[in-house]
Regions:
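Positively charged n-region of N-terminal signal peptides that target proteins for export
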Residues: 1-5
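Post-cleavage N-terminal segment of exported redox proteins
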Residues: 6, 10-12, 16-27, 228-306, ...
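Mature extracytoplasmic or organellar-lumen-exposed domains after removal of signal/transit peptides
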Residues: 25-288
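Soluble non-cytosolic domains of exported or imported proteins
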Residues: 38-42, 58, 62, 132-135, ...
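Amphipathic alpha-helical interaction segments
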Residues: 66, 70, 329, 428-435, ...
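Extracytoplasmic redox metalloprotein regions
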Residues: 94-157, 161-162, 312, 316-320, ...
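Short glycine/threonine-rich turn/loop motifs
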Residues: 276-384, 449-552, 557-560, 568-573, ...
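Extracellular low-complexity, Gly/Ser/Thr-rich intrinsically disordered linkers
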Residues: 551-604
Length: 610
């Protein structure tokens, strides 16, 4: 009997083992994501091969353009994962069609490459050489995609928390860059491409909507995504697309759902310094950005004591050699921390500096300081200004002695830097003032309130202006939402500069390019000649005059400059102008609408200083 039991047990075990080999075990989520990614890459490869063959056979231009647009749609599906997990390759495949440099080697010029270059080729001037030029670009893209397909053990990297971060990133990228036409500047195929992005997001999310999720959550999110796709497919015209409606009715609730689903399932990234707060449920939330990322290390992080000390120093002329000017002399709170001059008055009270005084609001949210981007940290900027012979002609070394002689300041430094020895140092002076500047955060404008759900905060004219700003007027391709400065989404780690071709004066009969060479003075890279940091447009109503040299007194004048195509329209553009050369063809009514929108960026916090 015992042997019979053993025999039956042995047979059953064998059957179970065999069944185990016959019936595959359920795939882990990362493996399912990898399978989806593989299918997307296969589809993209097919489309790339198709357009390559069309070039070989010298198809008509119209058919080549169509195949290009089809290829882009396939790319956008795969890009949800490519952009996040392969950021370096993304810059190669889909970077701007502009020569660039790296910060650590500005002398080395990197030629543009990828889809945007191919778009310029296919949609630009056409001759017999176009086919071979286009094919070379196609092969380059094809080789990179091939590397993705051949990557060994690819599934391991698709960890749940990273995939959900990729989804958040894709939503921000589509909102800030996609529907603005940033990466489809000529073809203006951005709306169909956004639909492809949403389709991919939906496919990825459905892998995670298992029995552990409530049916209500799954159905609500899927319905939102499906409706978003339908809306995009039904409103493909780039210039007429209602971005305000799309963002508030689809982007915002979908983004919230993605964040909630990830958080409820514990798909959270490890706690460390990164630009975005992963718990923030809206792209337009006042808590979207993690302030610590844009601050010094913990040792020199802002505290209330340091902010208060910095505020006193900011308005105290003790840092200047002449004792008659402070930081607040040129950065007046009632003027949104600008001075109202074309360019700042020098310390001698007779001459003027080369450049306009920028606002300090939201200075924390930029990774480059000064119009020429010559330094990264606010502390270094402060030191530069204090020691500048035209600005304050001061000395932090001397200031340490003079502040130390003040019982009031000595006590305040002891309180603010209790763990430092000594407490009063050159760096601590700079850090205290920088702590105050970092506290100047303003993200509570009428526009922000509208995007957070209060539909009473913007009227029809302002909403039309926003849609123009994001579309036909191309403003948002440089002044990125939600900050409206040059901090590039969705990573928010790089602050861009642009070459606009700004004139020396408002003279229109014989305009002359402003001689200030911008970033070039410090990098000596020809790419940076006449390049200036993209400033924020928040509170722009209060910060006239405008441009790096203060050449324009009104927003109407600024809009006229851009409407003509910048320096190109004035026939003074340098060869490396980054602003698109063509006219915007905005009507007077449309210009008024864009300006009306920009005035909604005036912040309630800033107005308290008026």
């Amino acid at each position: 009997m015992r042997w019979s039991v053993y025999l039956i047990g042995f047979v059953l075990s064998g059957i179970i083992i065999c069944i185990g080999f016959i019936i595959p075990s359920p795939l882990f989520q990362n493996e399912k994501i990898d399978q989806l990614f593989g299918r997307q890459l296969d589809e993209l490869t097919t489309k790339i091969n198709d357009i390559e063959n069309a070039c070989n056979q010298k198809f008509k231009r119209r058919l080549l353009k169509k195949k290009f647009l089809d290829t882009r749609l396939s790319y956008k599906k795969a890009a949800v994962l490519i952009d996040y997990f392969h950021p370096f390759e993304t810059r190669l495949i889909n970077g701007a069609a502009l020569a660039r440099t790296e910060d650590d080697s500005p002398e080395k010029i990197v030629a543009p490459y990828g889809f945007q270059v191919l778009e310029e080729i296919l949609f630009g001037e056409w001759d017999d050489s176009t086919y071979s030029i286009a094919k070379a670009e196609i092969i380059g893209i094809k080789n990179i995609i091939s590397q993705f397909k051949q990557e060994p053990n690819r599934a391991y990297k698709f960890k749940n928390e990273l995939v959900f971060d990729a989804l958040r990133s894709a939503m921000i990228r589509m909102t800030a860059l996609g529907i603005s036409g940033f990466d489809s500047p000529i073809a203006e195929n951005s709306i169909p491409e956004a639909a492809a992005t949403v389709e991919s997001i939906q496919s990825i999310l459905n892998i995670y909507f298992t029995n552990n999720n409530s049916n209500a959550s799954k159905e609500t999110t899927n319905k939102l995504l499906s409706n978003a796709i339908d809306y995009l497919n039904s409103n493909k015209n780039f210039n007429r697309f209602d971005r305000a409606y799309f963002i508030t009715n689809y982007i915002n609730p979908v983004f919230t759902s993605i964040v909630k689903t990830g958080n409820e399932n514990g798909f959270l990234l490890p706690k460390e310094r990164r630009p975005l707060n992963q718990l923030s449920e809206s792209i337009f939330s006042d808590s979207l950005f993690d302030i610590s990322f844009y601050s010094p290390t913990e040792r020199y992080r802002s505290t209330s004591d340091r902010v208060q000390l910095g505020k006193l120093l900011f308005f105290d002329p003790i840092l200047s050699a002449t004792r008659d000017r402070s930081c607040g002399t040129c950065h007046k709170p009632e003027l949104a921390f600008t001075d109202g001059f074309k360019t700042a008055l020098a310390v001698d009270q007779k001459t003027y500096l080369l450049r306009n005084t920028p606002t300090l609001w939201n200075s924390i949210f930029q990774t480059k300081q000064f119009f020429d981007s010559r330094t990264a940290m606010l502390e270094h900027q402060l030191s530069d200004v204090v020691h500048n012979q035209e600005e304050m002609k001061g000395s932090l070394t001397r200031s340490v002695k003079e502040l130390g002689a003040s019982p009031k300041y000595a006590l305040l430094f002891q309180k603010a830097y209790a763990n430092e020895t000594p407490t009063l140092t050159e760096y601590n002076i700079a850090n205290a003032i920088s702590s105050y500047v970092r506290s100047l955060i303003a993200v509570n404008s009428r526009f922000d309130k509208y995007m957070r759900g209060d539909k009473t905060k913007m009227n029809k004219e302002e909403l039309k202006g926003f849609n123009l700003f994001m579309g036909k007027a191309k403003c948002a391709t440089c002044h990125f939402i939600p900050l409206f400065n040059g901090l590039v989404p969705p990573e928010f780690t790089e602050t861009e500069s642009e070459v606009l071709g700004v004139p020396k004066s408002k003279e229109t009969n014989a305009p002359v390019l402003d001689s200030d060479e911008g970033r070039f003075k410090f990098t000596r890279s020809i790419v940076h000649k006449y390049a200036f940091k993209t400033p924020t447009l928040r509170n722009i109503e209060l910060t006239a005059p405008y441009m790096h040299n203060g050449v324009y007194n009104t927003l109407e004048e600024v809009m006229d400059f851009y409407n003509k195509g910048g320096g190109s329209g004035l026939k003074i553009a340098p060869e490396n102008q980054t602003l698109p050369e063509g006219k915007l063809n905005l009507s007077k009514k449309e210009i008024r609408e864009v300006i009306a929108f920009m005035k909604t960026l005036t912040d309630s916090v800033v107005l308290k200083y008026k």
